[in-house]
Amino acid sequence: MCIRDSPNVTQNRLNSLIDLMKNETIDGQRVIDKPIFRDRLLSIQGRLMAQQSNALRILSSQINKEQDANLAKAIVKLQGTELRHELEGLAIDAMGELGTLYEDSPHLRDNGAWQMTYMYYLGLIIGGGTNQIQKNIISERALGMPKEPKIQGA
C-alpha cells in the first residue's frame, strides 16, 4: 500500500474536508449543514473506518504470520483508491463553482490541491485499468473465478 493511500493520510484528508465543509457556504448555509453533503461525508467516514480496521487486520496477520495478507492488501488498495477519489470529489462539490477552478485564480482553494488530487485518483482508477486489475485479482484469488481468457495472436 502506498503511503499516499494509507488510512492515516486519508484520515488527515477527511479532517481537511470537514474543515472545508464548515467554511464553505451555499445560499448562506454551511455546506456541512446541508443533509445531502453531510450524508456523503458520513458515508466516506464509515468507509474510512472500515479501511482502518482492515489495515489493522493486515498488520496483525503479518505480525502473527497467521495467513497471507496479499489478498486483503489488494482489497484495501482497491477500496482506498475509490474512497480517496470520492472524498476529493465531495470537496470539489462542496466548493461549488469554485471547485471547477484548476489553475491560477484568486479564488482557488488550497492552491488547487483538491482538484489535483481528484485527478490523480481518477488517473489511478482508469489509467491502465488499475482498478480493473485489482478486481480481477480479487475475483480470481478470493472467489476462485476463472482467469480472463487470453486473446490469440495478441
Task: Write out the residue ranges for each language-model feature.
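Sequence context surrounding c-type heme c attachment/ligation sites in exported
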Residues: 1
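Alpha-helical interface subdomain recognition
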Residues: 4-154
